[in-house]
Regions:
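Bacterial signal peptide processing site
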Residues: 14-18
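Short, conserved, GDST-rich strand-edge loop motifs in beta-rich repeat architectures
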Residues: 84-97, 194-228, 389-405
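Gly/Ser/Thr/Pro-enriched helix-cap/hinge segments flanking short amphipathic alpha-helices
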Residues: 33-36, 44, 54, 360-366, ...
C-alpha cells in the first residue's frame, strides 16, 4: 500500500458554498458483484475467547458484554486489536481472574502482548483517543464496577483512572471521546446502565419471559428484564488540559437516570459543535443538542429520534451516524430487541423522519436481537451499507420461543441509492456463523483498502471477518491529524468529490456498541480511478480543500500543513 506524498492543493476561501464543485465525468458502471467475508480470526493469531461468567444465578451483566477496539496503540500504521473480557460476577477467590487482551498487528498477523493492558474486571466497553496529547492513543475502559483510564506511554500503559477522576463505580457501557466545548482537548462521555446489585438475593425481579410458561407449568430460569432496575445517570467529563477530567454532567444538563447502552457523538445539525446520541434500553433515547456554551438541550422526542415507529419506547442497544442517502446530512441507526426493528432515521433538514421500513431495514431485522452496528462501505461503491451484530440475551430462549435462538446470524444490508437489501446469505462464510454477538468495530487490518469487521461474541471466540469481496472497485483512505489538541481529527467532517459521486463522512471511532473502530475515513470510489477533491472541516472550524488524487492510496492530511509523507505500513 502507498501512503501519498503528493503535493497538497488547498483551494481558495473557507466556505463550501463559495467553491465550484468538480465537474461530473460520465462513466460506465460495472455489474454489481457480491460482498464476501471470511472468518479468519484463529488463522491470523486472534484465537481469543470471551468469558461472560455465566452462572446458574443468571446475573444481569453476564449477558450484556462485551466489546473491543481496532486501534493503533504503537503508531506503526496497522490497527491492533483490544478485546474486553468479562468474568464471574461473584468470583471464586481460588479461580483465575479473566483479563482483557491486546494483540499487536504485524502485517496482518496478530501476536498477544501485555503492554500493561491485561486489565482484570467485569469489562464492558472501550474508547481510544490521545487525551493527553503525547502522540499515542490512550484507552478508557468501562466495567461493571470502577472504570479506568489507561494512559499510553510509548506503547506501555498505566492505570490512572482514579488519579484522572474517571473511575466511576457504576455499570458503565459505551463511551466516546470528542471535544464538545471546542477548547482544544478531547472530553469524554460515559453511558451508564442500571443499578444492579448481585448480592440482593430474593429481590423481586421482572424476568424477560414472565409471560411464558413451560410445559410443566413454570417459566424456565431467566435473566432479569431492565425494568427491574432503576437507571443510572450518564457522565460527561471535561478534559482539564490533559491533566485529568472534571465531571460536568449536571452543569452541562445531562439528564439524570436513563439506561444507556450505546453512544455516539456527531455534528448532526452542521453548526460545528458535537452533539450526542444515547441509545437507552426500554426508556426514551436521548439526543443532546449542543448549545455552544458548555450545555446541551435534550431534543430526542422533538427531533423524532426518541421512540420507535409506534411511539413506544424500545430496547436501544447500539448506534451509528452516517449519510446513507448521500444528501450531505448525517442519518441515524439504532439497534433494538427481537420483534423491534432496527431503527433508521433520515435527517431531512430540521427534523428526522422514520425510514426503517421504507428504506428496507425493518423486515430483515425484525427476527433478530441486535447490538453492534456500523455504517460502512465494504464493496467500495460509495454507498454506506449497514451491519448489525446479533445474538439473544437469553441462553435458553429456545425453550419458550422456537422461532429464535441464542446464537444468531449477523446482518448485512447492501445500500443501492438509499434502499437496503439483505445480502447476508450471499456474503460469504463469515455470515454463515451463528454467534452471540455484542460489540463490533470496523478497520482495515490487512491494509488492502477495504474495511474488515471485528465482532465480539459473548462467551465465545471473537470473529475477524476479512473482506475478500474482489469487486475491483477503487478506494482512498484518509487519515487526519488535527491541530490544537485533537491529533487524530476526531469530529472532523470530510466531503469527497469524485465525478458524479459526493460522499460526506465524519471521523469518529467510538460508536456501535461498547466498541472502537479504526480512526480513519474509508472512501469507496466504485469504478472511478480518481478522487477529484477533498474538503475537510476540522473541529477547530478551519476548512481546507485538497486534491486531486489517484485512487489506491492512503492520504495523511495535517491541519494547516497539508499532506505528510509516511512510510507504508
Amino acid at each position: 500500500m502507498r501512503i501519498s506524498a503528493l503535493l497538497w492543493v488547498p483551494l481558495l476561501a473557507c466556505s463550501p458554498d463559495t467553491q465550484d464543485e468538480p465537474p461530473a465525468l460520465p462513466q460506465e458502471a460495472p455489474a454489481v458483484r457480491p460482498i464476501h467475508f471470511v472468518e479468519v480470526a484463529a488463522s491470523v493469531g486472534l484465537a481469543w475467547r470471551h468469558d461472560n461468567g455465566m452462572s446458574p444465578q443468571r446475573h444481569f451483566p453476564e449477558t450484556m458484554g462485551g466489546g473491543g477496539a481496532f486501534f493503533d496503540y504503537d503508531g506503526d500504521g496497522d490497527p491492533d486489536v483490544y478485546a474486553v473480557n468479562g468474568g464471574p460476577i461473584v468470583a471464586d477467590p481460588a479461580s483465575e481472574v479473566p483479563v482483557n487482551a491486546l494483540f499487536h498487528n504485524d502485517d496482518g498477523h496478530f501476536t498477544k502482548v501485555n503492554a500493561g493492558l491485561s486489565h482484570p474486571g467485569i469489562g464492558m466497553g472501550v474508547a481510544a483517543a490521545d487525551y493527553d496529547l503525547d502522540g499515542d492513543l490512550d484507552l478508557y475502559l468501562t466495567n461493571f464496577g470502577p472504570n479506568t483510564l489507561l494512559r499510553n506511554d510509548s506503547g506501555t500503559f498505566a492505570d490512572i483512572g482514579a488519579a484522572a477522576g474517571v473511575d466511576d463505580g457504576n455499570w458503565g457501557t459505551s463511551c466516546a471521546f470528542a471535544d464538545y466545548d471546542l477548547d482544544g482537548d478531547l472530553d469524554l462521555y460515559v453511558a451508564n446502565y442500571v443499578a444492579y446489585d448481585p448480592q440482593a438475593a430474593g429481590a423481586e425481579r421482572i424476568p424477560y419471559i414472565a409471560n411464558y410458561e413451560s410445559h410443566r407449568g413454570q417459566a424456565p430460569p431467566s435473566y432479569p428484564h431492565p425494568d427491574s432496575f432503576s437507571g443510572q445517570s450518564d457522565l460527561l467529563y471535561r478534559n482539564d488540559n490533559g491533566e485529568g477530567f472534571v465531571d460536568v454532567s449536571a452543569a452541562a444538563r445531562i439528564e439524570a437516570g436513563g439506561k444507556g447502552l450505546g453512544v455516539a457523538f456527531a455534528d448532526y445539525d452542521r453548526d460545528g459543535w458535537p452533539d450526542i446520541y444515547v441509545a437507552n434500553d426500554a426508556v426514551r433515547n436521548s439526543l443532546y443538542r449542543n448549545n455552544q456554551d458548555g450545555t446541551f438541550r435534550e431534543t430526542a422526542a422533538l427531533a423524532g429520534v426518541g421512540y420507535g415507529l409506534d411511539g413506544q419506547m424500545e430496547a436501544g442497544m447500539g448506534v451509528d451516524w452516517g449519510d446513507y442517502d448521500a444528501d450531505g446530512l448525517l442519518d441515524l441507526t439504532v439497534t433494538n430487541f427481537q420483534a423491534e426493528p432496527n431503527a433508521l432515521y433520515n435527517r431531512d433538514g430540521t427534523f428526522f423522519s422514520p425510514a426503517t421500513f421504507d428504506a428496507g431495514v425493518g423486515l430483515p431485522s425484525l427476527p433478530l436481537l441486535a447490538f453492534g452496528t456500523q455504517f460502512f462501505d465494504p464493496d467500495l461503491d460509495g454507498d454506506l451499507d449497514l451491519f448489525a451484530a446479533n445474538g439473544h440475551v437469553l441462553d435458553n430462549v429456545g425453550l419458550i420461543d422456537q422461532s429464535t435462538s441464542y446464537g444468531q446470524r449477523n446482518l448485512l444490508l447492501r445500500n443501492d441509492g438509499g434502499r437496503f437489501t439483505d445480502v447476508s446469505a450471499a456474503a460469504g462464510p463469515g455470515f454463515d456463523l451463528q454467534r452471540v454477538s455484542r460489540g463490533s468495530a470496523v478497520g482495515d487490518y490487512d491494509t488492502d483498502g477495504d474495511p474488515d469487521l471485528l465482532v465480539f461474541n459473548s462467551g465465545q471466540p471473537l470473529s475477524l471477518l476479512r473482506n475478500d469481496s474482489g469487486h475491483g472497485n477503487h478506494w482512498i483512505t484518509v487519515r487526519l491529524a488535527g491541530a490544537d489538541g485533537n491529533p487524530n481529527g476526531i469530529g472532523a467532517r470530510v466531503t469527497a468529490y469524485s465525478g458524479d459521486l459526493v460522499q460526506t463522512r465524519e471521523l469518529r471511532g467510538s460508536r456501535s456498541y461498547l466498541s472502537q473502530s479504526q480512526l480513519h475515513v474509508s472512501l469507496g470510489l466504485g469504478h472511478r480511478s480518481q478522487l477529484d477533491g477533498i474538503e475537510v472541516r476540522w473541529p477547530s472550524g478551519r476548512i481546507e480543500r485538497f486534491g486531486p488524487f489517484a485512487a489506491g492510496q492512503v492520504l495523511v492530511l495535517i491541519e494547516g500543513r497539508g499532506i505528510s509523507a509516511q512510510p507504508s505500513p
